[in-house]
Amino acid sequence: MSAITQFTRFKSDKSEEMVKTAKAAKAIFEKHGAEFFRMSRFHTGAWAGEWLIVTRYASWEVYGKAQEAVAKDPAFAKLMAHIPSFAQLSGRSISVGVDL
């Protein structure tokens, strides 16, 4: 089964707020089926200074169910309303793993 991985990039100079918000988001996404939720920061290249959020799901089915559940979660809605006050979404990509 191929894993589904979502990569989301944010621009923000508010490191403490990014970390605090990512910790809250991690609990929400993992509660709803993400295998993991990770955050890192680019230090070189075209995206230097941007933040990267990575979530992984076991399959498209799990991904779909998780997205549906997250969309209905009041805690997630609260986070989504807060994020624009300190960060800007700059990109999102989804990759499908290849089982070797």
Language-model features: locations:
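Short S/T/G/P-rich N-terminal loop/turn motif that feeds into the first structured element of a domain
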Residues: 1-77, 82-100
